[in-house]
Amino acid sequence: MSQKIRIKLKSYDYMLVDKSAEKIVKTVKAAGAMVSGPIPLPTHKRIFTVNRSTFVNKKSREQFELSSYKRLIDIYNSTAKTVDALMKLELPSGVEVEIKV
């Protein structure tokens, strides 16, 4: 089953992404596969500008920023034991995981 598995992690909190990536790397290394990463991908920032008042004062505005953080992990020489270990792994609820085989 020796194939490459690519895992993308995405979250609005960088600490959750880093802890999840660390957990995955530790689990995969314990299962005996090779790991490349976690590789930090560019942070995507969305900025929203809104008026402070509902009706007047166009010059008075407020900006909000929403940042999403991403990490990439590549797993090489994976076995059935590695896949089982990844399936049993519990990650925090604020992390989106995308897996490509």
UniProtKB/Swiss-Prot annotation:
UniProt keyword annotations, A-Z: Ribonucleoprotein, Ribosomal protein
Disulphide-bridged cysteine pairs: none
Keyword Ribosomal protein part of the UniProt annotation: yes
Taxonomic superkingdom: Bacteria
Single GO BP term: translation
Annotated SUPFAM superfamilies: Ribosomal protein S10
GO cellular component assignments: ribonucleoprotein complex; ribosome
Any GO molecular function: tRNA binding
Pfam families in the cross-refs: Ribosomal_S10
Keyword Transmembrane helix assigned: no
Chain's role: Involved in the binding of tRNA to the ribosomes.
NCBIfam families (alphabetical): PRK00596.1 (NF001861), rpsJ_bact (TIGR01049)
Protein family: Belongs to the universal ribosomal protein uS10 family.
Assembly and oligomerization: Part of the 30S ribosomal subunit.
Alphabetized PANTHER family for the sequence: 30S RIBOSOMAL PROTEIN S10 FAMILY MEMBER
Record's protein name: Small ribosomal subunit protein uS10
Gene name in the database record: rpsJ
